Regions:
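Peri-catalytic and regulatory segments of divalent metal-dependent proteins
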Residues: 24-104, 110, 114-118, 142-143
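Short helix/loop segments within enzyme catalytic domains
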Residues: 28-59, 124-173
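Bacterial N-terminal signal peptides
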Residues: 9-21
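Catalytic toxin/effector domains delivered as secreted proteins or via bacterial secretion systems
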Residues: 121
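Pan-zinc metallopeptidase signature
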Residues: 168-184
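N-terminal secretory signal peptides that target proteins for export/translocation
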Residues: 1-4
Length: 184
């Protein structure tokens, strides 16, 4: 069914997604021992279609597995297990984004891979520098337009208003606002 929905996507993008999904159907669960935030594999055709579009736009040739990210708020992340990249998306993010916004946020995560943002110290703390986030935003916006990227960043900022403690909420809001400002 997913193949029919994806229609005219390139063979390489299909191979990268479907071969990895077939060979590692439970890879998200295997890796969840390493990263407790990752859960079941995402097979939603809308997410797969957005990911294929990003892979084609980026020229990425690395295998990707899409995993549900266990967090109570809108978020996305990229992690790796060897040469395999795992993109984590929360259900809330998938449910509250348009197709264009979904491509923008997946594009942002794949931009981290393309730009080589793989500092081991950053990965240990699951934080990235503001500069690397802005560069990933800019690359995703170049692939799919500024408006979807700005829109999804605004949704992330609005959702960050639920974070506790207040210091974390204020910091996240300010960082996301700065990223929106940098794109305009």
């Amino acid at each position: 069914m997913a193949r029919r929905l994806l229609g005219s996507v390139s063979g390489l993008a299909l191979v990268l997604i479907f071969s990895v999904q077939l060979l590692a159907a439970d890879r998200c669960q295997q890796v969840s021992a390493h990263n407790k935030r990752l859960g079941i594999e995402i097979t939603d055709p809308r997410v797969i279609s957005a990911t294929v579009a990003v892979i084609e736009a980026s020229g990425l040739k690395a295998p990707i597995v899409l995993c549900e990210l266990h967090m109570p708020y809108i978020n996305a992340t990229v992690d790796h297990a060897g040469r395999l990249y795992l993109i984590g998306l929360t259900k809330t993010l998938i449910e509250h984004t348009t197709d264009a916004e979904l491509r923008a946020i997946i594009g942002h995560e794949i931009a981290h891979i393309v730009l080589g943002h793989r500092n081991p110290m950053i990965e240990l703390t699951h934080h990235r520098t503001a500069k690397s986030e802005q560069k990933a935003d800019e690359l995703a916006a170049r692939w799919f337009g500024k408006e979807p990227m700005v829109s999804v960043l605004n949704k992330l900022r609005d959702d960050a208003a639920r974070l506790q403690p207040a210091r974390l909420r204020e910091q996240a809001g300010a960082e996301l606002e700065a990223r929106v400002k940098a794109l305009r």
